[in-house]
Each structure stands twice: as C-alpha cells, then as structure tokens.
C-alpha cells in the first residue's frame, strides 16, 4: 500500500519489509523463520538486531553504537534482569506474577505490595519511606497516604467519576454534564482556584473560565472542520491564530500580545513534513534533520543577534543524548536498558531564551526575553563555559503506572553538593518532598499544573481562610500548545503535568521531546501510520493539532481528554514486559498490528502458567482498551476469576487460560461493536490524503478486522 508521504512493502505474512518516507529515507526489516523481528536497518545505516530463545523471549538486542541489551528470564518466562552498558536492572515477582521490586542500575530498590485483585497497596522507596493505597469494591483508588503521612482521599459518583479529592490542606470538587464532560472544578484550602468549561457538539473544549485570587480569566478556543485548533483567545487580550496545510502542518501563527501588538510567524516544510524554516519578518530559523528524522540543528539568522546555532545529538534509538546551545549552555543525557532517562547533566546558565523566543521577541503576556551578553556567541565556536560546575540529576522511576513516572531525582554538582526531591502519586502527582519542604500540586481541568503550593515540612497547619505567611503559591498558565505564560518561565512539572525544561523549551514526553514553541515534536514518530488515526500520517504532529481536547503522555499516541478523565480511578496493573523503553517503541511499531490480529491464537499456545496468564491479562488491558471503561471491566473481572481459583488444582493453569481466552473474546466483541464509530476516519483520509475508493475500502476492512481481532484478515 502506498501512502501520500511514502511507501511500504510487506511479505505474504503481513510482516513489514521496507518503509520509505517521502524524502527517500528507507528502513528495512528482516524476520526469523518463526516470524520474529530479527533486524532493523535504519535510514542512516545503523543496524539493530534481536536474538530470541526458543519460546520467543528476547535475549539480546544490539541497539546500535556498539551497545547491547541482554535480558534474563525465570522459569515461567518473566524478565528478571536487563543489562546494558549503564548497568543491570533487576526485577522480582510474587506468585501471581506481579512486580514486587525493581532495582535500578545504581542499586536503588523500589518495592511493591498488592491486594488479592492486583491493586498496588504500597510502594517503598530506597530510603525506606512508603506510600500506601486503599481501594473500594470497584477497585477504584480511595486513599493515598503520602511520604509525610498526609492522607489524600478520593470520592466517586454512581457513574464512577471522581467528584472530590481531599487532603489535610486542599479539597477539590468536580462536576460533570450528562455525557461525562467536566463542567466545573474548584479547589479550596491552602489556595483558592476554580475552573469551568464549555464544549462543542463534538466534545471539544471551546471555553475555560479560571478564577483565582478574585481575578477571572476567560479563554476561548475555535476549531476547523477537522478538529484542528484555529484560535486561542484570552480575556486579557492575548490571542493566537493558526493556519495549516493539508497535511496538518502549521503554516502560520499570529500572536497578539496583551498590548495589542501582532507578531506573525510563518513556517515552511519539506515533503517529509519536517519543519524547515520559521520566519518573522527578515529574521528566520532554519532547521535540519538526520536521516532518521530527528532535528539536529537550529540556526537563527537575525538582525539583532546575528547567527546563532543550537545542535542536538541522538543515539541509535533516537533518544536525545546531547544539546549544545548557541551560548555554550550544554546538556547531556543517559538512558537505562528500558529506554528511560537515567540522568541529565548540564553546565552553563540555564536562565536563557530559546532561539524561537529570540526570533519572535518580547510579546506581552509571554515570558520576557533574556538578553544575550556580549561575550555570548553562536555554537559554531561558542565561548565554552569555563570554570563552571556541571550539575547531574539522576532519576528513579515507578514502573507500575501506565506511563512510568519519576518518583525521585537527585542533583549533584561537580563540587559535591547534593539535593533530592521525592514525589508521591495517587490518581495524579500529589506532592514533591525535599529535606525541608512539601510542594502540593493543583491542576486545571485538563491536567496541567495550575499551582504549586510549597510549605515547610515542620510548619504549622494551613488555615483554609488565611494561609500561613510561610506558604508560597506559584501559579501557572499556558498557551493552547503549552508555552508558559506570564513574565518568567520555570522548569519542572507543568503543561499536562509533564517535565518541562525552560532552558531548552522542551517537554519530555518519554519517547520523544515536544517543543511547545514549534507546536510539534522534534523527533519523528517511529510508529508506521495507523489506519485508524488520520493524522498519524504526519509523524511530527502533536495531539492532532487539538491540544486542548487531546493529551499525549508518552510521545507516541494522543488520547482524547474525555477518555483520559473517564479512566480516572481505574487501576489496571501493568507487569513489566520483556522489551523496554526505546527499543520497545521500535519492536511494537513493527509487530503491533500483527499481534493484535493473532493475540488469541498466541495466547492459546503460549499461556503455560498462571503468571503468564496474569501478565497477558494486564498487557491485553493496556493494549486493547486505550482506557475504555467497558473493556477494563472485562479484564478486571477475568483477573478476579483467576485470583479466586485454587492454585493447587492440577487443572489450575487450564482453567485460568480458559478464563483469559473468554475475556479476549468478550473484549474483542465489545470493540467490534464500536467499529462503526470509526467510519468518519474514512472520509477524513479521503479528503486529506486523496486515497482512492478501493484503498479506502481496504482500510475499512483493516479497521474492522483489527478491532475484531480476525486472525485470517489479509491486506488483499
């Protein structure tokens, strides 16, 4: 099948053999006789190879740059160790196959306990501190006891929607319309802030009213027929307007400051949908990419600043490994065998403006430009930062959440000074803890951090009427695509509750880096186009150009905000798989659809133990549902049935397997019923990408087949 932006070839078994993008960059794939992915030859010539045992478990991965990742398994096929040049990660499980501990490459161990239904009941940090959790009869989280002993409680309505979050210092209430859209959200206690929302007939947010400190700010959003955001207007007078080409690339962004002054930015792209220039009058930034589609340079040519260059470097898995700024500011990154960022090292002054900020200049309502000192030059011969200390931050993660989360970060300077921040999570990130303070997070209705409330650990109780003078409240607001507003920008968890780096303007979304000022990712999505999702044909788009009503937590797939909200309270447990992080992205991209088509038959032959069954139930829940409540309910019911079986019964595995297969079939039936709702994508694809009618009909067959898990479906 040929796409508007390139072509791909598959063998008779449906295995992807070659993929060529519109720029002529070709990726090749090879498979073992069993059909397992054996090698990937990337566009830049890098070869990734994979070795398996006789059961198909991945043993050795050559991940490029001369680096390998080796995996070990226990007798029932669950990964116990993953080793790379950075060190070894060790996993331990209980009898039901649930992950009970992870020891990272630095020797830091995180431990977990569970109830009979697989809900995590506690997490113990390396220093011995613990966060504990309770659940109701529907397996919804009802309380979290944090690192300081403070309890956060959750209450739900009859429809399963969260209606209150309450701790000793903050209480947030939620109200919804008849279809589950959030209408109001109000927080009281240590701080007072409220939000209300309005929607169009498609469920997209059209308005937000924020009330804080007696001040009300209204934001309105408009969309085109394809659901792309076309304007963002605040009652402060700040405004952004957007125009797009047929591929969804933003071609113009007009920013109007609160002072009424307009700035028009024009963008151009190559046929691979890569941003090549951003222009403001006579000034411009030129962007270049490597053959794998990752941005490697930005060059600003400006009347005010001359020529300034940023440079980026990546490993063979397209993970950012180095940033060298126009002013000599530098960052370096390392990753573990799971592809998770292990450390960030930086040197130089991080209080700086990005090239995009310098290009557009000061705009009333956005952070002020940090002017360059005369000694600062471009990265081509930049003044190297001499006499400055490097600072290295190491990260520790919780792997049991749907999207792995940082639970601790320790920053150490080359001079030896060190500080640690730990994080506690419930239905979202609750608070950050240092040696002498606690910072609680308050969110807007979209899930972005609206306030960070910091108070001394040993401080007096906070009055809901008049906060103690030692309490510091920091407020955040954002443009539609996620740039921080106000006079200054701050690094930390912010837009969509993800980690923002103010020095580089990047949001770390795990698999890729998102740049709000560009409204897009700086790295190509390695997943092939998904025929169910129109805009996946453009590998750089963020949330289908609808960032107010969609979120992207992993840099791979956007989900509607309503779907994310509807999943609140569900606690499906994910067990660590045999492939992690960056390489998991590569492998899943190739075998994902095939696995979906054959999952039931695979399970029938591969489910040899209850631990494998439980693991597959968890994986199935994560892979099929995209947080669909009905399918999660089916999977949870299967887990309960399996947990209720007598493990000493000789027929135990057979019975557990039968329960799982029945859940597969029931979930598939449910998803098949929803296939008709995807019909609108056919029209979108035809209108936007010019597919012929026969191609559209083939896509429809694939769509229905995928959702029905039809093992016999072929492209012809």
Task: Label the predicted regions.
Residues 219, 361-368, 375-377, 460-463, ...:
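Low-complexity, glycine/serine/proline-rich disordered segments
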Residues 341-344, 350, 451-455, 483-487, ...:
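Short, low-complexity export/processing leader segments characterized by acidic and small residues
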Residues 331, 497, 527-530:
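Conserved short loop/turn motifs at secondary-structure junctions
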Residues 478, 524, 528-529:
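Peri-catalytic substrate-binding/gating loops that frame the active-site cleft of hydrolases
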Residues 532-534:
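Short linker/helix segments within small regulatory modules
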Residues 1-5, 18-24, 39-45, 60-66, ...:
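Beta-turn initiation residues at beta-strand->coil junctions
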Residues 5-7, 120, 264-271, 434-511, ...:
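A motif-centric feature for acidic-aromatic and gly/ser/thr-rich catalytic loops and repeats
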Residues 1-18, 26-36, 47-57, 68-78, ...:
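Aromatic-rich beta-strand edge motifs centered on tyrosine
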